[in-house]
């Protein structure tokens, strides 16, 4: 299985409504994109200075299915909204 990890730091100017809009968009992705096998996300609970504000971990059977997710229009729409409210986004993909 491939794991896809995303972490972001929100801009100081990011509104609660904008963050909630991204979360709502993410909630719908597993029903729209059948390639998603696992999908968990949430805001940081520790809120330490070193912590990122938001994380997402998703799982895919193989690289081809992860690529279909990556280019899916519904995913791209959420990514665009996430980029608007984040100062920094980190990505990691690994086999598990």
Residue spans of the language-model regions?
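Short, flexible helix/strand-to-coil boundary loops that buttress conserved ligand/catalytic motifs
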Residues: 70, 79-82
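Short S/T/G/P-rich N-terminal loop/turn motif that feeds into the first structured element of a domain
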Residues: 1-53, 61-71, 94-96
